[in-house]
Swiss-Prot record:
The lineage of its organism: Bacteria, Bacillati, Bacillota, Bacilli, Bacillales. The keyword Hydrolase applies. SUPFAM superfamilies: NagB/RpiA/CoA transferase-like (SSF100950). Keywords: Carbohydrate metabolism, Hydrolase. It comes from Bacillus anthracis. This is Glucosamine-6-phosphate deaminase. CDD domains: GlcN6P_deaminase.
Length: 262
C-alpha cells in the first residue's frame, strides 16, 4: 500500500488528478470507478480545469440512493452530471438506478456492467466508521452489488446535503466489497481529523469485516492520499509498514502504477 501525505486539499486534488491522468493516458479504453460526496470534489475540479481527454473513458459509479429521482439535486446522477458529465465528453457513463422497479434485478444488471467494464482505477473515500461505498461494518468481504439500509451514523453524516433529516434516504444501491476489490488499482482519499480513526484501522487495524476498509490490506495496488490530520492517530512506524511516497512523481515512478493487478 502506498501512502502519499499532503498538506492541503489542493495538494490532494492535484495528486489524485495526476494518478487518474496517468491511467487515462496509458490505457487504451480505461474504466474509472467514481465516488461521490466531498472527498473527490477537488479531483473532479482538476479534471475540469485541465480538460482531461475522457473521450475513451467509461465510468462506473459506486452507489446511488434508492427512490431519489435522478433530477433531484442530492442524487448521485445529478452530482455526477454537475461535477463531470456536463463538462467532459465521456465514452460511456454508468450510475446504479435507484429508481428501478426491481432493485434486485438492477443489482444483477450493474454487476454485469462491471464484468463487461473491468475497473482500472477505483476512487474511494472512507467513512468515519470505515465504510467504503455504502458498505457498512459487518458487510461480507465477498459481497456483490446490493441494496443496503443506511445506518443512522451514515444518514447523519449525509444530513448536511439535505434540508431536513426525513429527506435523507434510508436505502441505497452500492457496489459490494467484492465488486470493489476487483478493481486493478484503488485510490483512497482522506482529509481531516474526523477520518483519523478509520484511517488508523485501515492501515494498522486487524483485517476484519467490522471495518470494511481493512479489506484493502489484501489488495495488491492501493494508494492512500491523506493529510496529517487524517493520519494523526497512526503510529510513527506507519511509513515502515507501508511504502510512503513524498511526491506524486515518486508515486508514478512505482512500476506497479497503471499495471494490471491480479
Amino acid at each position: 500500500m502506498n501512502i502519499l501525505v499532503v498538506k492541503t486539499p489542493e495538494e490532494l486534488a492535484e495528486a489524485g488528478y495526476k494518478l487518474i491522468e496517468e491511467v487515462v493516458k496509458t490505457k487504451e479504453n480505461p474504466t474509472l470507478g467514481m465516488a461521490t460526496g466531498s472527498s473527490p470534489l477537488g479531483i473532479y475540479a482538476e479534471m475540469r480545469k485541465n480538460k482531461l481527454d475522457t473521450s475513451r473513458v467509461t465510468t462506473v459509479n459506486l452507489d446511488e440512493y434508492v427512490n431519489l429521482p435522478h433530477e433531484d439535486k442530492n442524487s448521485y446522477h445529478y452530482f455526477m452530471q454537475e461535477q463531470l458529465f456536463d463538462h467532459l465528453p465521456f465514452k460511456q457513463t454508468y450510475v446504479p438506478n435507484g429508481m428501478a422497479s426491481d432493485l434486485e434485478e438492477e443489482c444483477k444488471r450493474y454487476e454485469g456492467i462491471l464484468a463487461a467494464n473491468p475497473v482500472d482505477l477505483q476512487i474511494l473515500g472512507i467513512g468515519e466508521n470505515g465504510h467504503i461505498g455504502f458498505n457498512e461494518p459487518g458487510t461480507p468481504f465477498n459481497s456483490p452489488t446490493n441494496i443496503v439500509e443506511l445506518t443512522e451514523s451514515t444518514r447523519q453524516a449525509n444530513l448536511r446535503f439535505f434540508e431536513k433529516e426525513e429527506d435523507v434516504p434510508t436505502h441505497a444501491i452500492t457496489m459490494g466489497i467484492g465488486s470493489i476489490m476487483k478493481a486493478k488499482q484503488i485510490l483512497l482519499v482522506a482529509m481531516g481529523s474526523k477520518k483519523a480513526e478509520a484511517v488508523k484501522e485501515l492501515l494498522q487495524g486487524a483485517y476484519s469485516e467490522a471495518c470494511p476498509a481493512t479489506v484493502l490490506q489484501r489488495h495488491p495496488n492501493v494508494t492512500v492520499i491523506a493529510d496529517q490530520e487524517a493520519l494523526s492517530l497512526c503510529s510513527e512506524a506507519i511509513a515502515d509498514e507501508h511504502r510512503q511516497v513524498f511526491t506524486i512523481s515518486d508515486l508514478l515512478s512505482d512500476s506497479r502504477v497503471g499495471e494490471t493487478a491480479n
